[in-house]
Amino acid sequence: MKSLVLYSSLTGNTKKIAYTIYDEIQEEKDIKDVNELVDYGIDYENYDIVFLGYWVDKGICDKNSKQVLENIHNKKIALFGTMGASEKGSYGASIIEKIESIIPKDNEILGSFICQGKIAEGLKAKYKEMLKLSPDNEHIRQQLNNHEESQSHPDEQEIYEASMFAKNMMIKASIV
């Protein structure tokens, strides 16, 4: 079984998870940074499973990952991503649901993994400005509160969980 790990990473969080997944795959494999690809027309024909890693932008995957996902057909797909907020609760689940909904129906989604990543310093300043305009916006307030907590993410536990996710997806891909 041959695997392709694709990832888009703005701050290095998703790249860290991508290489954790890549290192866990024991069979033939390739890894590519979506943002370095000139043409999104990747030949998926030689791959049995595609792992696609994204970073969360405004409640969904980044635009380059979205473009790639919309152009994958007839493949087994495992999604992984990072987000500045905690992935726990309904917000993380809603992101996964939105992303899975943009994948063409001729693919088989094996599973999804999402974890918290370090929030970029530039976003902290942006959120402070946004909060001035919308002081009652709970999501923005959560992002600011999360900033300090996020600095250690993805942490050792999340790296371990990503590793287990990769193993489970490879097992699932070989069974289905």
UniProtKB/Swiss-Prot annotation:
One of its GO terms (biological process) is heme biosynthetic process. SUPFAM superfamilies: Flavoproteins. One of its GO terms (molecular function) is FMN binding. Pathway: Porphyrin-containing compound metabolism; protoheme degradation. It holds the Pfam family Flavodoxin_3. NCBIfam families: flavodox_BilS (NF045594). Together with BilR, catalyzes reduction of mesobilirubin and/or bilirubin to urobilinogen, a key step during heme degradation. BilS is probably involved in electron transfer for the bilirubin reductase BilR. This is Flavodoxin-like domain-containing protein BilS. It comes from Clostridioides difficile (strain CD3). The gene is bilS.
